[in-house]
């Protein structure tokens, strides 16, 4: 498919989370600037006849080239992936022949904690749009209505995940005060039964950037924070998350605070302190914890940018020990992925045999299919 901007007839697209760019667009329009002149805002995409407005752009393969050659498409995607960091990204240009170019400006900078708090302090109705009333609402809302977002972004960097394109690899967090304020608001909802279903984000237990360098120089372009092993500069610390969960447990009207999914098991294994694992098992699991090892073949995991199967096994041993110490019998339910590029029949059989030996039938398996992010 062509760019959404080319097909939709829109003048401008705001991509990513959009809070910074949408305000800058509004200010530009309010000042009387014609929309075709708004070509300078990070986190936006615009159309133009030539490259005169783009500052030192990287010219990607044309639309015609990527739509006719899958290897060229992959090359273009790789360039786009390397330009997802707001500190180091360059403008990207894709030619549409006689129709001109699509120019993507670098991503907007991450929000500060105060800005995150301001976003979540807006007067949301916490329900579906009225247009859905006639159809009985949106059933899926029940799953998330009493969940709390504590962070945004993820430095996990899994190769199959589109999160880097949407929220970036630099972690952004809300303050404890902001999250507690929302929890107190939840307790006043007539449908609230005392259970907070989730506290987290793309990765539940990330509460600070992976290292201080990210805040001023951006993320490393050609290496990951956790793969193939944790970076020496990685700050592994669950202290802030544990503190937040303790405060939430004390909110009047809250019976239980659950973490149902999103725990990054290799980050937990890398933490030298056992406190998070102990309190996770003791207070925050409703019978089972969903985790995402994705596969059991180390070769496939390497292609995915995920930790080795041995790391997952280490996590399971520590999880079982913590359950035994607290007198609980709780389960870790794995997410697996089929059809990933590089996964051979032999790898698939190995995964099937592993699942068979676990003695249960997975209810959820993600089947990989390649799509643009």
Q: Which residue ranges define each predicted feature?
A:
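N-terminal [4Fe-4S]-dependent radical SAM core
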Residues: 72-147
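Catalytic cores of alpha/beta
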Residues: 275-276, 340-356
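Glycine-rich beta-alpha loop elements in corrinoid/cobalamin-binding modules
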Residues: 1-97, 104-105
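N-terminal pre-triad scaffold of radical SAM enzymes
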Residues: 135-162, 195, 369
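Conserved SAM/AdoMet-binding glycine-rich loop
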Residues: 185-333, 337-341
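Conserved alpha-helical substructure of the radical SAM core
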Residues: 167-195
């Amino acid at each position: 498919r062509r760019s959404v901007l080319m097909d939709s007839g829109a003048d401008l697209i705001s991509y990513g989370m959009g809070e910074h760019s949408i305000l800058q667009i509004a200010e530009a329009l309010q000042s009387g600037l014609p929309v075709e002149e708004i070509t300078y805002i990070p986190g936006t995409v615009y159309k133009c006849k030539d490259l005169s407005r783009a500052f030192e752009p990287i010219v990607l393969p044309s639309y015609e080239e990527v739509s006719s050659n899958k290897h060229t498409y992959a090359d273009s995607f790789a360039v786009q992936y390397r330009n997802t960091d707001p500190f180091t990204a360059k403008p990207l240009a894709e030619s549409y022949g006689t129709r001109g170019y699509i120019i993507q400006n670098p991503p907007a900078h991450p929000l500060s904690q105060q800005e995150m708090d301001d976003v979540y302090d807006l007067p949301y109705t916490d329900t579906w749009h009225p247009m859905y009333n006639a159809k009985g609402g949106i059933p899926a809302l029940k799953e998330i209505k009493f969940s709390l977002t504590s962070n945004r972004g993820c430095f996990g960097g899994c190769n199959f995940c589109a999160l880097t394109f949407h929220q970036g690899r630099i972690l952004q967090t809300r303050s404890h005060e902001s999250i507690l304020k929302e929890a107190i608001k939840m307790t006043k909802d007539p449908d609230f039964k005392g259970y907070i279903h989730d506290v987290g984000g793309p990765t539940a237990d990330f509460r600070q950037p992976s290292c201080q360098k990210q805040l001023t120089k951006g993320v490393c372009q050609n290496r990951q924070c956790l793969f193939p092993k944790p970076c020496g500069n990685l700050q592994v610390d669950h202290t802030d998350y544990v503190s937040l969960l303790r405060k939430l447990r004390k909110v009047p009207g809250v019976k239980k605070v659950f973490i149902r999914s999103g725990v990054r098991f290799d980050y937990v294994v890398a933490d030298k302190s056992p406190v998070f694992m102990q309190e996770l098992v003791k207070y925050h699991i409703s019978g089972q914890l969903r985790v995402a090892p994705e596969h059991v073949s180390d070769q496939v995991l390497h292609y995915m940018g995920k930790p080795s199967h041995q790391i997952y096994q280490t996590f399971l041993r520590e999880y079982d020990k913590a359950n035994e110490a607290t007198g609980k019998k709780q389960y870790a339910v794995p997410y697996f992925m089929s059809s990933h590029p590089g996964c051979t029949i032999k790898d698939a059989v190995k995964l099937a045999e592993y699942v068979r030996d676990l003695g249960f039938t997975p209810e959820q398996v993600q089947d990989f299919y390649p799509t643009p992010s």
